[in-house]
């Protein structure tokens, strides 16, 4: 440093090693400026006098110009370039003065030069991540924590910023679209209050149970669906806003989650066979904490030193995993995935891979979540909790591109309910590879529905239910007369979210009630569907309950409750199942309540997110349906005090006539082969009470 300040830098200064220096911290030092003439050099340092120097000089003695205000080459040291000039940015020639100003140089010219091999930093997708797929949009990326990275991601190969592609908003005024602004914060607060999730204590956050985990997942799904409806109304379908990420982020910010404590073994409240449509659902209930990485692990002190042990893995096709026969899984370690720049490398025995290797020797149980493609949404996935496995062995081998990868063979712990095996069996039934055991009729509907409904009994020798006539929809003796003609929509291509010119959307409070996947986005007292006078086609989103069941269903014999109904396909929360078909009868004009649906009974509300400002919130007349002599598959749906299906009142209007229907929707995600049940309601007169055999934790002991 001294040499740089001396005019003669050839002779190094002599150092007096006998002097004792008073060393002080930098923050205690004050700048010392050259003493003016006539003043002692040891006096108290004074502030430097203010000197205004123009960029081009003249400069006071001892002050050198710096780039970009550097003197020209003829300033006294010809042939020497400034050491402060960035490489690749030439000095400006010619006389240096205001008459000839220099060109401005951007600040990014001062960046550190790149290496010859280019930037080898992390690519946009972490190399140790398992593939991450949701049923919305794949543009966002999550780290292994909970921070969302959505914009301005640096591309290491080009140096250009690359992030979520911004989709131009549709010209709302030109297309007749009116954005509906809704504050979601009060909506979330209302949901959390209704489900008693405000200010969860630390004990429940650390260790949950089935009831709490169910409430957390239900609030997440209700809130996510409502935000999907709001986003589509504002930006149109396919806006790619990822309401699942926003909903989960808001919930976790408010501390709404459970099973935060990492553990080996099952997560409390999560049953083997439970399904999830979003990776964030796994995080909220503590089944698998990382939002992208396929391996979750924890540090355990078993000896003098801590060592990592795997607690859960997600196998969803990101690597060359082998699903085996349902009890065996060959899992590929993380890392070594080909990057965007084409580089490939060997996997390393670190982090998750090291934890799996340690678990081989410790023989601890590992939770396994299998991901399968969502047939209804090709870019999405469904995550199945397949229970506990143990790692039997591990080895290294070459993959398809010649790099070393780690392989782990996991065996399922015996004695657990079947989960992934059920999915494989159902696929074999659909493909005709294997036959369904106990089939009495291959299609109970005789072709009346678009999907066949088989009749199955693998319990006893009963050959089927009592005879009835299958009718796919509701029969009215006469429609309900409206006091004034109802408006009909003119959406030739189908009703679209945010279209203020659509009369049916206006009747639903400015929102379409269904998503493009047929999911009910918000629960209302009354849903207005398109009627026969509307111009939209039969496949319009607002005719969801008019097309019959979308899932492959079966009627089966239960062990102690007669015949029941279940699905071969997974059903999303809010997914449409079927309508209650039969004959509309007068209220109170029935003595036998078997195969009766009575809308006048008292039903427990599902949630607090109801539009109580809706003028049509009350049923205009008591709706009672009898399916004893004629009906559809809904007549086989049994009662439960903790149901997984909820009914909604739907009206279809045409001119001055209207018909009311009962449509069933899934309350939460329903895995295949789980019985579909709904609450039959409470009779106001408390008549015809029957013993309940639903077996749920909240069973009342009776039903009507």
Curated annotation (Swiss-Prot):
Is the keyword Cell membrane in the record? Answer: no
Q: Which residues bind Zn(2+) 1?
A: 489, 491, 495, 502
Q: Using the record for this protein, list the coiled-coil segments as residue ranges, or answer none.
A: none
Q: Which residues form the Post-SET domain?
A: 688-704
Free-text domain note: The SET domain is required for methyltransferase activity and ectopic effect on plant growth. In the pre-SET domain, Cys residues bind 3 zinc ions that are arranged in a triangular cluster; some of these Cys residues contribute to the binding of two zinc ions within the cluster.
Per the entry, what this protein does is: Histone methyltransferase. Methylates in vitro both 'Lys-9' and 'Lys-27' of histone H3. Required for in vivo dimethylation of 'Lys-9'. H3 'Lys-9' methylation represents a specific tag for epigenetic control for plant development and transcriptional repression.
Protein name, per record: Histone-lysine N-methyltransferase, H3 lysine-9 specific SUVH1
């Amino acid at each position: 440093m001294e040499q740089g300040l001396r005019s003669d830098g050839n002779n190094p200064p002599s150092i007096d090693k006998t002097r004792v220096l008073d060393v002080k911290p930098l923050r205690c030092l004050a700048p010392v400026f050259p003493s003016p003439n006539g003043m002692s050099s040891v006096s108290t340092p004074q502030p430097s006098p203010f000197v205004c120097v123009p960029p081009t000089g003249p400069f006071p003695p001892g002050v050198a110009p710096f780039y970009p205000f550097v003197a020209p080459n003829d300033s006294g040291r010809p042939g020497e370039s400034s050491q402060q000039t960035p490489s690749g940015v030439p000095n400006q020639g010619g006389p240096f003065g205001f008459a000839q100003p220099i060109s401005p140089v951007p600040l990014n010219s001062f960046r550190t030069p790149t290496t010859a091999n280019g930037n080898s930093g992390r690519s946009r997708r972490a190399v140790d991540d398992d593939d991450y797929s949701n049923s919305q949009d794949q543009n966002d990326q999550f780290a292994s924590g909970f921070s969302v990275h959505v914009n301005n991601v640096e591309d290491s190969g080009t140096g250009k910023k690359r992030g979520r592609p911004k989709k131009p908003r549709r010209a709302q005024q030109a297309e007749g679209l009116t954005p509906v602004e809704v504050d979601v914060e009060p909506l979330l607060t209302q949901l959390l209050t209704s489900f008693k999730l405000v200010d969860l204590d630390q004990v429940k956050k650390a260790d949950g149970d089935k009831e709490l985990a169910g409430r957390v997942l239900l609030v997440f799904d209700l809130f996510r669906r409502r935000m999907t409806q709001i986003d589509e109304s504002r930006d149109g379908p396919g806006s790619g806003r990822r309401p699942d990420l926003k909903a989960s982020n808001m919930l976790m910010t408010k501390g709404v989650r459970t099973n935060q404590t990492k553990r080996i073994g099952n997560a409390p409240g999560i049953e083997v066979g439970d399904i999830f449509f979003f990776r964030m659902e796994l995080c909220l209930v503590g089944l698998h904490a990382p939002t992208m990485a396929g391996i979750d692990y924890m540090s355990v002190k078993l000896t003098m030193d801590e060592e990592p042990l795997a607690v859960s893995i997600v196998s969803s096709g990101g690597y060359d995993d082998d699903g085996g026969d349902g009890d065996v899984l060959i899992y590929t370690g993380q890392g070594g995935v080909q990057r965007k720049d084409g580089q490939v490398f060997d996997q390393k025995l670190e982090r998750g891979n090291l934890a799996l290797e340690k678990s081989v020797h410790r023989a601890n149980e590992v939770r396994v979540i299998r991901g399968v493609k969502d047939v209804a949404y090709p870019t999405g996935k469904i995550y199945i909790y397949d229970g506990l496995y143990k790692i039997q062995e591990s080895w290294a081998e070459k993959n398809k591109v010649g790099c070393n990868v780690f392989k782990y063979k996991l065996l399922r712990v015996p004695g657990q309910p079947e989960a992934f095996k059920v999915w494989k069996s159902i696929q074999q039934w659909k493909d005709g590879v294997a036959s369904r055991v106990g089939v009495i009729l291959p299609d109970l509907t005789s072709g009346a529905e678009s999907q066949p409904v088989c009749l199955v009994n693998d319990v006893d020798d009963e050959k089927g239910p009592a005879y009835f006539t299958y009718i796919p929809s509701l029969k009215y003796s006469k429609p309900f007369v409206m006091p004034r003609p109802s408006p009909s929509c003119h959406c030739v291509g189908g009703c679209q979210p945010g279209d203020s010119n659509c009369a049916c959307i206006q009747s639903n409070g400015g929102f379409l009630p269904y998503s493009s996947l047929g999911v009910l986005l918000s629960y209302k007292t009354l849903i207005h569907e398109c009627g026969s006078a509307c111009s939209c086609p039969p496949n319009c989103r607002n005719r969801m309950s008019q097309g019959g069941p979308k899932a492959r269903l079966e009627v089966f014999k239960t062990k102690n409750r007669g015949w029941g109904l279940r699905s071969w396909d997974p059903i999303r929360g809010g997914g449409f199942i079927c309508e209650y078909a039969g004959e509309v009868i007068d209220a109170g004009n029935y003595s036998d309540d078997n195969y009766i649906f009575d809308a006048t009974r008292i039903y427990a509300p599902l949630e607090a997110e109801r539009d109580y400002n809706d003028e049509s919130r009350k049923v205009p007349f008591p709706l009672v349906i009898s399916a004893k002599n004629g009906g559809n598959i809904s007549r086989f749906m049994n009662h439960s005090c903790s149901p997984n299906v909820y009914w909604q009142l739907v009206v279809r209007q045409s001119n001055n006539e209207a018909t009311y229907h009962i449509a069933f929707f899934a309350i939460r995600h329903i895995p295949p082969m789980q019985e579909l049940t709904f609450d039959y309601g409470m009779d106001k007169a408390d008549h015809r009470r029957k013993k309940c055999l639903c077996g749920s934790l909240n069973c009342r002991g009776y039903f009507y």
